[in-house]
Regions:
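N-terminal presequences and immediately downstream first alpha-helices
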Residues: 1-13, 107-108, 115-116
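Interfacial loop-to-helix junctions that mark the boundaries of transmembrane helices
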Residues: 3-12, 62, 87, 138-150
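Single transmembrane alpha-helix segments in multi-pass membrane proteins
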Residues: 8-57, 65, 74-91
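Hydrophobic/aromatic residues within the transmembrane alpha-helices of Major Facilitator Superfamily
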Residues: 17-18, 25, 100, 104, ...
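Residue-level recognition of pore/gate-forming positions within transmembrane alpha-helices
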Residues: 48-49, 72-73, 98-102, 157
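Membrane-interface starts of transmembrane alpha-helices
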Residues: 59-67, 90-93, 97, 145-152
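Transmembrane helix-bundle core of multi-pass membrane transporters
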Residues: 102-166
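Short cytoplasmic-facing helical segments at TM-TM junctions of multi-pass membrane proteins
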Residues: 169-175
Length: 175
C-alpha cells in the first residue's frame, strides 16, 4: 500500500510540476544570458488566465494552450524590451510584471463562470499512452499516464540542455 501512495504522489508531482518545468526552463535560458527575470510568476499568471479564458470561450484546450503561451511570451517580450533595449532596472520590471500579472489574473479570474471553472479544473488532455501501459508495476503510472504537455515539457528540458551545452550559441550564452 505504501508503494501505491508513493507512486501516486510522484505521478501527481510530475503532472502538477509541468508548468514550473516549462517556466524554469525558460528562466534558465534567461539567467544564462545575464538577464535577471523576476517576472516569471507574473508571466505564468497571465498565461494561465488567458489560457483559461480562451479555453472557456472556444471550448478547445489546444486554443487555450496556444493563447496562454502566446500571452506569456508577449509579457516576456515586454520585459525584454524594458530590461535590455530601454535599460530599465531588471528588478523593477520583474516585480512590476508580477504585480501586473497578479492583478490582471485576479480581475479576469473573478469574471469567470464557476461552472466553467469546475469543468476545466480536471485534466482536459487525454493521456498519450494506452491504459495497458499504466498497469506496468512501479514505472507504468509514473511514466505513461500523462498528457502530451508533460512529455513536451520534458522535451523542452532536453532541448535546452542540448542547446546550452552542445552548440556554439549555447557556449556564447554561457560565456
Amino acid at each position: 500500500m505504501n508503494n501505491w501512495i508513493l507512486i501516486q504522489s510522484l505521478v501527481v508531482a510530475v503532472s502538477a510540476g509541468t508548468p514550473l518545468v516549462l517556466a524554469g526552463t525558460g528562466e534558465v535560458l534567461t539567467e544564462r544570458s545575464g538577464v535577471l527575470n523576476l517576472g516569471v510568476e507574473g508571466m505564468m499568471l497571465i498565461g494561465a488566465v488567458t489560457g483559461f479564458w480562451a479555453t472557456s470561450a472556444s471550448s478547445s484546450p489546444v486554443v487555450g494552450l496556444l493563447v496562454g503561451a502566446a500571452s506569456a511570451a508577449a509579457f516576456s517580450m515586454i520585459h525584454a524590451v524594458l530590461a535590455i533595449s530601454m535599460r530599465v532596472n531588471q528588478i523593477v520590471t520583474g516585480v512590476g510584471l508580477v504585480i501586473l500579472g497578479t492583478g490582471m489574473s485576479s480581475f479576469i479570474g473573478d469574471q469567470g463562470d464557476p461552472a466553467v471553472v469546475r469543468k476545466l479544473s480536471g485534466g482536459i488532455f487525454e493521456p498519450v499512452f494506452p491504459d495497458s501501459f499504466h498497469d506496468w508495476p512501479g514505472i507504468g503510472p509514473l511514466l505513461f499516464s500523462h498528457d502530451p504537455v508533460v512529455y513536451v515539457s520534458w522535451g523542452f528540458v532536453a532541448l535546452a540542455e542540448w542547446y546550452i551545452f552542445r552548440t556554439r550559441r549555447g557556449m556564447n550564452l554561457r560565456a
